[in-house]
Swiss-Prot record:
<dbReference type="GO" id="GO:0006605">
    <property type="term" value="P:protein targeting"/>
</dbReference>
<keyword id="KW-0811">Translocation</keyword>
<dbReference type="GO" id="GO:0065002">
    <property type="term" value="P:intracellular protein transmembrane transport"/>
</dbReference>
<dbReference type="GO" id="GO:0043952">
    <property type="term" value="P:protein transport by the Sec complex"/>
</dbReference>
<keyword id="KW-0813">Transport</keyword>
<comment type="function">
    <text>Part of the Sec protein translocase complex. Interacts with the SecYEG preprotein conducting channel. Has a central role in coupling the hydrolysis of ATP to the transfer of proteins into and across the cell membrane, serving both as a receptor for the preprotein-SecB complex and as an ATP-driven molecular motor driving the stepwise translocation of polypeptide chains across the membrane.</text>
</comment>
<feature type="binding site">
    <location>
        <position position="87"/>
    </location>
    <ligand>
        <name>ATP</name>
    </ligand>
</feature>
<dbReference type="GO" id="GO:0005829">
    <property type="term" value="C:cytosol"/>
</dbReference>
<dbReference type="InterPro" id="IPR036266">
    <property type="entry name" value="SecA_Wing/Scaffold_sf"/>
</dbReference>
<dbReference type="InterPro" id="IPR014001">
    <property type="entry name" value="Helicase_ATP-bd"/>
</dbReference>
<dbReference type="InterPro" id="IPR011115">
    <property type="entry name" value="SecA_DEAD"/>
</dbReference>
<feature type="binding site">
    <location>
        <position position="892"/>
    </location>
    <ligand>
        <name>Zn(2+)</name>
    </ligand>
</feature>
<feature type="binding site">
    <location>
        <position position="904"/>
    </location>
    <ligand>
        <name>Zn(2+)</name>
    </ligand>
</feature>
<dbReference type="GO" id="GO:0031522">
    <property type="term" value="C:cell envelope Sec protein transport complex"/>
</dbReference>
<keyword id="KW-0067">ATP-binding</keyword>
<dbReference type="InterPro" id="IPR014018">
    <property type="entry name" value="SecA_motor_DEAD"/>
</dbReference>
<keyword id="KW-0479">Metal-binding</keyword>
């Protein structure tokens, strides 16, 4: 109560921020007449002046009013577009490393030019991050003329660019590209063969467009570069033939019949588990197929690989659906992004799932992959000195932006008041009734000339609706992952009279739907148009625009509620841009996934009480509230998953930093002999301690064992026993020093024989090659640790703490092995001349090129990645037998110490 009164008196944090920024906008507006009077050359010269002032010690904040005024004036002269005051506020919010929530159509692309120009003055480079290549290229071309007029260079970062072109792009003042490409470039740079092969420079300032999509929706899935492991295609095919024989266990089955099912299905967690009966049944199938010995069991260590294949095949058959989760095109399984509805060619699910889906669809099976490098978006974007973002819908996720990224959200007011009519949800009993009502709504809009945008959650649903519209003889366009090549053209015409457009999820996001269509698109169709022709096109568009406004503006139809309220708001936000008229309504049914899994009991209870008849819909605030509560549950669960992914990746991130910094140091220095010397001493002291324990009696010394190891591992043929026999005063410390001195002397002789520069180059090559190989193996070991760590919860241990402890032990092992292997190789190898070093460098280069050719870029399946830790409310691992159901008042198996009902039982 008190906080509400306080907010009314002094305003919310958002209001106070806007009041402060409006004062700076007033300063910028006062500069406008002065900048209008400048000649073009004088305006261009401002960039040189600002850079000089920065070098003399001024900071960006003091330059901001003049820099923003410069960009506004240049935009007016080149594009005839003047930045609104609210866009100036948005630009300042971005410059302050915050998130600007700006409604659709408020000009986010133009707003971004302000902080981009200001921060590019430093010469450190600005990255504008978009959700797809099309938007990166479009925005770069849109703003290129403006930036180049002001003396800035503009680049585009897209996949498959030649390395030299990519390197040049990163040297540009302002670089547009996708989140995936920036992340993969970072990983590739840290796998580079030579320092000059790297393309990125330091990460300074990033403006993330559609920041909610990139930093939240895609944050559950890490970026992974992987390479092919062993070929097991035949096994995938043979296992695939067995899976259709398995029967799902129905949760409603009584205890008497429950044992008859072979697996349980968890739609929420996208997981399957074999029951005890299923385990026995699968074992028999494998024995009959000759894949397992008669007296063997599925869970014996020798059959871990079989279990992995069974689990992957089962998930492929019962959880992953064609035209929803993936499409089959040109004999290839292509993943469909669940957030954007776009296909992701070249991306593959991990853990053998992709191969299992390929076996299921009967297409060519590609080799399983091994992780070579990996990072989450959270940890990648936190590498930037300054990070900011803009979107139409961020306020619902403001807490997550603040807690994960340290970014505050500021809601920017619209330039004109919002005029869209958001109508209440209509809920039907069946999907068929829902689609019939949608068709009727579309017919009505089409007859009165009102354009309609229909949002669906999957390709399958968009094609189902498309077929229904064809039967009703209603002309329409489909915008989904299968047809995104025509995306810009379809979106450009989506606002024309009577246009009906079906869009999967958020396909087409980032492109405004203009009422009456796009006059620019019509002008682009003309070859070398005259000014008269352009004016004629504009006049024709104005008539069409006014007619569409009179019909009610763009009407949005949602065919299902998404898991996140934010994505529903994004769909609604396509209508009512810049104060235009518009409307929106969601049509739901009790058969929708969200309703079925999360909201069915409460809502269906309401509908039964009301005595619903076929074709009748319910529209009530209670129903809308129940649906929003279901969405909040899912949002909370997804936040937990993302937070958990980050907590686990933070452990790996600390290790990644150490390895990448070491690698960076190795590539940038010419002489690592001092490092090799320290390592040699440490390794020999460690080996000495194994055979001659500290402060021990001579009877406990294993001199013979030490002699053998020194000869075998370090090519040191030392008469240790003879030394001891001939010198009574030779004790433990003296002997250790004598061995180290002998090793140093032998290495010095090697250096003299081959030459100092040859050996320095060889040391560096050996160190890098060994580090890369061990890091790859370490990543595989970390993956395996992650997959089984959640089982520690059953032993009353905290999985997260166990993961930290064991991963630290693994990493210590990696560093110890690195030192030992490098010292051993350098001691044993016979380097004759520079050609030997060059041969090794060439071999390493060829291996690197071959690995690069065979690399797969993955955005790993999130649920598959997160089979662990406290966030895993189910027993995800196939190695666990079906456990009894956890009581609501019992301790949660995750190891948090809370009761189950207060922890994962809430979800």
């Amino acid at each position: 109560m008190f906080s509400k009164i306080l907010t009314k008196v002094i305003g919310s944090r958002n209001d106070r921020t806007l009041r402060k920024l409006r004062k700076i906008v007033d300063q910028i507006n006062k500069l406008e007449p002065q900048f209008e009077s400048l000649q073009d050359e004088e305006l261009k010269a401002k960039t040189i002046e600002f850079r000089a002032r920065l070098e003399q010690g001024e900071d960006l904040d003091s330059l901001l009013p003049e820099a923003f005024a410069t960009v506004r004036e240049a935009s007016k002269r080149l594009y005839g577009m003047r930045h609104f005051d609210v866009q100036m506020i948005g630009g300042m919010v971005l410059n302050d490393s915050q998130i600007a929530e700006m409604r659709t159509g408020e000009g986010k692309t133009l707003t971004a030019t302000l902080p981009c120009y200001l921060n590019a003055l430093t010469g450190k480079g600005v990255h504008v991050v978009t959700v797809n290549d099309y938007l990166a290229k479009r925005d770069a071309e849109t703003n290129r003329e403006l930036f180049e007029f002001l003396g800035m260079t503009v680049g585009v970062n897209v996949p498959n660019m030649p390395p030299q072109e990519k390197k040049q792009a990163y040297l540009c003042d302002i670089l547009y590209g996708t989140n995936n490409e920036f992340g993969f470039d970072y990983l590739r740079d840290n796998m580079a063969f030579r320092a000059e092969d790297r393309v990125q420079r330091e990460r300074y300032f990033a403006v993330v467009d559609e920041v909610d999509s990139i930093l939240i929706d895609e944050a559950r899935t890490p970026l992974i570069i992987s390479g092919p492991a062993e070929d097991s295609s035949e096994l995938y095919i043979r296992i695939n033939t067995l899976i259709p024989q398995l029967v799902k266990q129905d949760e409603e089955d009584s205890e008497e019949y429950r044992g008859e099912g072979h697996y349980t299905l968890d739609e929420k967690g996208k997981q399957t588990h074999l029951t005890e009966n299923g385990q026995e049944f699968v074992e028999q199938l494998l024995k009959d197929a000759g894949l397992m010995e008669e007296d063997d069991t599925l869970y014996s260590p020798a059959n871990i690989s079989l279990l992995h294949h069974i689990n992957a095949a089962l998930r492929a058959h019962v959880l992953f659906e064609k035209d929803v989760d993936y499409i089959v095109k040109d004999d290839e399984v292509i993943i469909v992004d669940e957030h954007t509805g776009r296909t992701m060619p070249g991306r593959r699910w991990s853990e053998g799932l992709h191969q299992a889906v390929e076996a299921k669809e009967g297409v060519k099976i590609q080799n399983e992959n091994q992780t070579l490098a990996s990072i989450t978006f959270q940890n990648f974007f936190r590498l930037y000195d300054k990070l900011s973002g803009m979107t139409g819908t961020a306020d619902t996720e403001a807490f997550e932006f603040q807690s994960i990224y340290g970014l505050d959200t500021v809601v920017i007011p619209t330039n004109r008041p919002m005029a869209r009519n958001d109508m209440g949800d209509l809920v039907y009993m069946t999907e068929a009734e829902k689609f019939a009502a949608i068709i009727e709504d579309i017919k009505g809009c089409s007859e009165r000339g009102q354009p309609v945008l229909v949002g669906t959650v999957s390709i399958e649903k968009s094609e189902l609706l498309s077929n229904a519209l064809k039967k009703a003889k209603i002309k329409h366009n489909v915008l989904n992952a299968k047809f995104h090549e025509q995306e810009a053209d379809i979106v450009a015409n989506a606002g024309t009279a009577s246009a009906v457009t079906i869009a999967t999820n958020m396909a087409g996001r980032g492109t405004d739907i203009v009422l009456g269509g796009s006059w620019q698109a019509d002008v682009a169709k003309l070859s070398d148009p005259t000014e008269e022709q352009i004016q004629a096109v504009k006049a024709k568009w104005k008539e069409a625009h006014d007619a569409v406004l009179a019909s009610g503006g763009l009407h949005i139809i949602g065919t299902e509620r998404h898991e996140s309220r934010r994505i529903d708001n994004q769909l609604r936000g396509r209508a009512g841009r810049q104060g235009d008229a518009g409307s929106s309504r969601f049509y739901l049914s009790m058969e929708d996934a969200l309703m079925r899994i999360f909201a069915s009991d409460r809502v269906s209870g309401m509908m039964k009480k009301l005595g619903m008849e076929e074709g009748e819909a319910i529209e009530h605030p209670w129903v809308t509230k129940a649906i929003e509560n279901a969405q909040r549950k899912v949002e909370g669960r997804n936040f937990d998953i993302r937070k958990q992914l980050l907590e686990y990746d933070d452990v790996a991130n600390d290790q990644r930093k150490v390895v990448y910094e070491l690698r960076d140091e190795l590539m940038n220095v010419d002489d690592i002999s001092e490092m090799i010397g320290y390592n040699r001493q440490e390794v020999l002291e460690g080996l000495f301690g194994q055979y001659i324990p500290p402060q021990s009696l001579e009877e406990m010394w294993d001199v013979e064992g030490l002699t053998i190891r020194l000869r075998a591992d370090f090519d040191l043929d030392l008469p240790l026993q003879e030394w001891l026999d001939n010198d009574d005063k030779l004790h433990e410390d003296n002997l250790r020093e004598k061995i180290i001195e002998a090793a140093v002397q032998v290495y010095k002789e090697k250096e003299e024989s081959v030459g100092e520069s040859v050996l320095r180059n060889f040391e560096k090559a050996v160190m890098l090659q060994t580090l890369d190989g061990l890091w790859k193996e370490h990543l595989a070991a970390m993956d395996h640790l992650r997959q089984g760590i959640h089982l520690r919860g059953y032993a009353q241990k905290n999985p997260k703490q166990e993961y930290k402890r064991e991963s630290f032990e693994l990493f210590e092992g990696l560093l110890d092995t690195l030192k030992f292997d490098v010292v051993s190789i350098l001691s044993k190898v016979r380097v004759q001349q520079q050609e030997d070093v060059e041969r090794m460098e060439e071999q390493r280069r060829l291996q690197a090129e071959e690995a690069a050719r065979r690399q797969q870029l993955q955005h790993q399946n999130a649920e598959n990645q997160l089979d662990d830790g406290e966030g895993a409310e189910e027993a995800h691992s196939p190695m666990v037998r079906e456990e009894r159901k956890v009581g609501r008042n019992e301790p949660c198996p995750c190891g948090s110490g809370k009761k189950y009902k207060q922890c994962h039982g809430k979800i």
